[in-house]
């Protein structure tokens, strides 16, 4: 069973960026090597879960990376595009990928690497930036080890808290003022035959400096939903009743999805199939691209 603490601990490097807007950071095991072989400043930071199964073999992965300065603080702007190379046992896998930095409306600039890893195993990921090679590694697991819905999966038809039935979640929405996305339950939305947008986030209790205003961006982008069901699910059921969020009860949707991270965006088409997913950090431009398939 998912514990509330896992929502913080599963982020690896990103989880070390405690407190929204905090400038503290950790490179989380990533290393930095100059092109000539000597040490240099900066590091590649994986802003996605590292200590829990997250990347599935054979499924498209979106891996947001940050670049840190010499003090380990993530850069607010990144010159790009940045070239990424994926390798295994010293052998490149596929072609290098040029990644455009994103930073519109988020606390830190980031690089969303899109890559499909064919097989389970440990892969090396490197990025060329400022004349240096920034290196890290990722673990890819068999698809069966991941239960959170991925692109191509059906969005699970589970009940979510609403204004009519809060299901024990208090507050129902921690945004101030509250958002308008708590009138329809997720199971009803999936069965409606309409596209759906699901945001799992806790605006008032964000625990990383990169979580960003995802819910606000969705509100800004969607406006009047019209023929689209938009649902916001809080992460914790009782955050104000505990003195430590690690002791809080996980809310119904992230518990049902077995999520070890937040925030997250799931975009499903009219048939209920997930067509886009954005975890941890999503800027305005990338959000527009994720919503495009249902607009």
Model-flagged regions — what are they?
Residues 191-205:
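Short active-site neighborhood of thiol/selenol oxidoreductases, capturing the structured segment around
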Residues 263-276:
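A short, hydrophobic beta-strand/beta-hairpin element that forms part of a small beta-sheet core
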Residues 35-122, 126-171:
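Contiguous segments within soluble domain cores/interaction surfaces
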Residues 274-295:
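Non-catalytic, surface beta->alpha helical segment in thiol-disulfide oxidoreductase systems
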Residues 1-21:
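N-terminal export signals
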Residues 235-261:
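Thioredoxin-like thiol-disulfide oxidoreductase module
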Residues 19-30:
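Bacterial lipoprotein signal-peptidase II cleavage site
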Residues 208-223:
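Typically the conserved alpha-helix immediately C-terminal to a functionally engaged Cys/Sec
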